[in-house]
Amino acid sequence: MSNEINLQEFKMHEKDSGSSSYQIARLTQRIAHLTEHLSTNKHDVSSRRGLLKMVALRRKLLDYVKREDMAQYQSLIQRLGLRR
């Protein structure tokens, strides 16, 4: 994959796996991987459904971060290269 995301920079501490920023970064990584998969496997409907669920979850998490901490939201959008 060409757009590897360094998940370590999104962790709040060493064992962090639940913070919103880490979850969003991890979902972005999985979404990119699935998008690449679906470009070659156009008829994989179950993966497409999973992709849509991941995109919706990332959207909800981004809305939460935006509501709670606008500076962190702006930083996440910029570092992950998301359109908003």
Swiss-Prot record:
Cellular component terms (Gene Ontology): cytosolic small ribosomal subunit
Keywords associated with the record: Ribonucleoprotein, Ribosomal protein, RNA-binding, rRNA-binding
A GO term, aspect molecular function: structural constituent of ribosome
Entry keyword Ribonucleoprotein: yes
Coiled coil start-end: none
One of the protein's GO biological processes: translation
CDD domains given in the database record: S15_NS1_EPRS_RNA-bind
Domain of life: Bacteria
Protein purpose: One of the primary rRNA binding proteins, it binds directly to 16S rRNA where it helps nucleate assembly of the platform of the 30S subunit by binding and bridging several RNA helices of the 16S rRNA. Forms an intersubunit bridge (bridge B4) with the 23S rRNA of the 50S subunit in the ribosome.
Similarity annotation: Belongs to the universal ribosomal protein uS15 family.
Complex and partners: Part of the 30S ribosomal subunit. Forms a bridge to the 50S subunit in the 70S ribosome, contacting the 23S rRNA.
HAMAP family in the cross-refs: Ribosomal_uS15_B
Protein name per UniProt: Small ribosomal subunit protein uS15
Natural source organism: Akkermansia muciniphila (strain ATCC BAA-835 / DSM 22959 / JCM 33894 / BCRC 81048 / CCUG 64013 / CIP 107961 / Muc)
Lineage: Bacteria, Pseudomonadati, Verrucomicrobiota, Verrucomicrobiia, Verrucomicrobiales
